[in-house]
Regions:
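Functionally engaged cysteine thiol sites
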Residues: 34, 38, 42, 63, ...
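Beta-hairpin "wing" of winged helix-turn-helix
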Residues: 65-75, 82
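Residues within the DNA-recognition helix of helix-turn-helix
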Residues: 60
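N-terminal helix-turn-helix DNA-binding core of bacterial DNA-binding proteins
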Residues: 11-55, 79-87
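Generic alpha-helical secondary structure signal
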Residues: 25, 63, 85, 102-103
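Amphipathic alpha-helical dimerization/coiled-coil segments
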Residues: 1-16, 86-113
Length: 113
């Protein structure tokens, strides 16, 4: 019995999906999404939680917002950021769980070792 092969993705969808994974390849952006997955937050709180400067976090939030991965709303003088797409929350959670494992860290052998 053969396993069915799915149809190839349309080039534009493939490009957009690759761009999303590219954005998530920066550990700071991944950490920001991880934190926002558990609730909304402002830049200062995210900066403190990530150990990054407010300017750095603002820069990464702008990229995430432009890509549609986070949204923002104004509360008085501050911007509050949040993730309202359950698919993004699930994607980040699945990636984290994929790498979270037993207490012993995984070791990877270098090629040719």
């Amino acid at each position: 019995m053969s396993i069915p092969v799915p149809e190839p993705l349309p080039p534009d969808l493939l490009q957009e999906t690759a761009a999303t994974f590219g954005l998530l390849s920066a550990s700071v952006r991944l950490q920001i999404l991880w934190l926002l997955a558990s609730g909304e937050s402002d830049v200062g709180t995210l900066a403190e939680a990530t150990g990054q400067s407010v300017a750095t976090v603002s820069h990464h939030l702008a990229k995430l917002k432009l890509a549609g991965l986070v949204r923002a709303r104004r509360e008085g003088k501050r911007q509050v950021y949040f993730v309202d797409d359950s698919n993004i929350v699930e994607l980040v959670g699945l990636a984290v769980e994929h790498h979270r494992g037993p207490a012993e860290p995984k070791t990877h052998r270098a090629r040719g070792a």
